[in-house]
């Protein structure tokens, strides 16, 4: 950030203080408004934590500055916690007032500060996109687990004698599927792709198989029969899954490139 400017470097060296941190010690703390100092990391690396969670995609490694945003806006709270990740981290601590004074006296330095802010903003946006891409299927597993547990709970409740077989079988399936879909739709990542895939899969199964259910409403057990579809006219119905598949692919492309 100093860009080899000896005048600026000497100003910071004269006013600054060498400080060291051991692994696990906080350099700056999220939400802090009292400390508006800037830390020029001279050696070592630090991890970034937001709301107590470590950002695996972001690490501050020397030479780099930490805390300049709060130095320029002293009333602003620290947006993240920066914690020493190296065995020992050495930094030059410059008070926020000194940093603001140097920035105000040197336009070129101010331009470099803004460029650094812009670069970190792009990095954060990129990291957010990557995080969203990798978390989509994790949410699918969560949704499936919620659906299975809900279905199991309903089945356990209705397992006692006296309930018709179709109630003990059908109701848990309906509840489980409903909970699965509701949980799935709660996650905005790839919802169109997964929902479209679910629709296509359901239609393909329906077209490929014949379903028969036999039995009386009261008392008698139901007989289920599933067989391959032998009707050649059903091949024309594959147009619907193809259209839905194309739509799902288009929405998936929007999710991955436009968001």
UniProtKB/Swiss-Prot annotation:
Cross-referenced InterPro entries: cNMP-bd_dom (IPR000595), cNMP-bd_dom_sf (IPR018490), RmlC-like_jellyroll (IPR014710)
Biological processes, Gene Ontology terms: defense response to virus
Transmembrane segments: 136-156, 169-189, 234-254
Keywords: Antiviral defense, Cell inner membrane, Cell membrane, Hydrolase, Membrane, Nucleotide-binding, Transmembrane, Transmembrane helix
Region (TIR-like): 126-229
Keyword Cell inner membrane: yes
Membrane topology: Multi-pass membrane protein
One Gene Ontology cellular component annotation held by this UniProt entry: plasma membrane
Enzyme Commission identifier(s): 3.2.2.5
Record flagged with keyword S-adenosyl-L-methionine: no
Reactions catalysed, as given in the entry: NAD(+) + H2O = ADP-D-ribose + nicotinamide + H(+)
PROSITE patterns assigned to the protein according to its UniProt record, in alphabetical order: CNMP_BINDING_3
Compartment annotation: Cell inner membrane
Residues the entry annotates as binding a nucleoside 3',5'-cyclic phosphate: 1-120
Molecular function via GO: hydrolase activity; nucleotide binding
Gene3D superfamilies the UniProt entry points to: Jelly Rolls (2.60.120.10)
Entry domain remark: Has an N-terminal cyclic nucleotide-binding domain and a C-terminal transmembrane domain that may also be a Toll/interleukin-1 receptor-like domain (TIR) that might have NAD(+) hydrolase activity.
Function: Pycsar (pyrimidine cyclase system for antiphage resistance) provides immunity against bacteriophage. The pyrimidine cyclase (PycC) synthesizes cyclic nucleotides in response to infection; these serve as specific second messenger signals. The signals activate the adjacent effector, leading to bacterial cell death and abortive phage infection. A clade B Pycsar system. The effector gene of a two-gene Pycsar system. Expression of this and adjacent uridylate cyclase RsmPycC (AC A0A1V0HUX5) probably confers resistance to bacteriophage. The genes are probably only expressed in response to bacteriophage infection. Probably only responds to cUMP (produced by its cognate NTP cyclase), it may act by degrading NAD(+) and/or by impairing membrane integrity.
Protein name in UniProt: Pycsar effector protein RsmPycTIR
Upper taxonomic lineage: Bacteria, Pseudomonadati, Pseudomonadota, Alphaproteobacteria, Rhodobacterales
């Amino acid at each position: 950030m100093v860009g080899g400017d000896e005048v600026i470097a000497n100003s910071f060296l004269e006013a600054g203080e060498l400080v060291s941190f051991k692994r696990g010690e906080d350099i700056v703390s999220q939400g802090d408004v009292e400390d508006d100092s800037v830390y020029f990391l001279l050696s070592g690396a630090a991890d970034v934590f937001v709301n107590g969670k470590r950002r695996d995609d972001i690490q501050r490694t020397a030479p780099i500055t930490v805390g300049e945003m709060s130095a320029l806006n002293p009333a602003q709270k620290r947006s993240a916690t920066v914690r020493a990740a190296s065995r020992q981290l050495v930094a030059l601590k410059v008070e926020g007032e000194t940093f603001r004074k140097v920035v105000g006296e040197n336009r070129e330095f101010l331009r470099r500060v803004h460029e650094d802010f812009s670069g970190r903003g792009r990095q954060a946006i990129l990291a957010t996109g990557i995080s969203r891409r990798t978390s989509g299927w994790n949410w699918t597993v969560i949704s499936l687990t919620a659906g299975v547990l809900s279905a199991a709970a309903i089945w356990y409740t209705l397992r006692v004698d006296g309930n018709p077989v179709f109630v003990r079988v059908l109701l848990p399936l309906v509840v489980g599927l409903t909970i699965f879909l509701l949980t799935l739709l709660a996650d905005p990542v790839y919802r169109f792709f997964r929902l479209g895939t679910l629709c296509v899969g359901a239609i393909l199964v329906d077209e490929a198989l014949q379903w028969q259910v036999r039995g009386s409403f009261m008392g008698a057990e139901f007989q289920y029969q599933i067989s391959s579809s032998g009707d050649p006219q059903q091949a024309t119905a594959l147009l619907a899954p193809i259209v839905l598949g194309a739509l799902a692919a288009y929405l998936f492309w929007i999710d991955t490139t436009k968001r």
